[in-house]
Amino acid sequence: MDFSELLKPYLKKTNKTYYVALSGGVDSFVLLNELLKIRENYDLKLSAIHINHNIQKNSLKWKNFCSEFCRKNHIKYFSRTLRKKTDFSNLEKKLRDERYKIFESILDKNSILFMGHHLDDTIETFFLRSMRGTRLEGLTSIPKERNLGKGKIIRPFLDLTKTEILKKAKEDKLKFVNDLSNRDNSFDRNY
């Protein structure tokens, strides 16, 4: 499968800036790599935004890993580090809210922020919301597109599974961060 075909509908030959939410994980690295492959054909101004949540012991290594990849590939790199948390109640929501505030503060007019969410994330979100007793209208899936401040969020991989993304990373010999918290059942998303 040609993953870049999923991106092309969102690329305009205009003076837009395209950002990638770069966690360091496989989803965001495959996404950024696909944009790199077509950057010259579309004259893309690429930037990456990395948020260091400051809760994992390896978070500084991940930040540096992302920074180095961007430096080598001439990608403008934004990095923000969140303050250490002492209150862990509702942590996932708090971190998500902080991430989106940062994204919104960086996006400029008409810019696009690509995010690496995929089909497995959509299924996970549906079940998490249903377990929490969300009303029917709240069970809608993760939107492929939505506005955020002056820009727009695009999730081009929502029809792909995690397995397909991992396969693509292997084909392209991509290195990425393996976040062990993804196996930690104390986070609702992993339960």
Segments from the language model and where they lie:
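Core alpha/beta nucleotide-donor-binding catalytic domains of modification enzymes
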Residues: 1-191
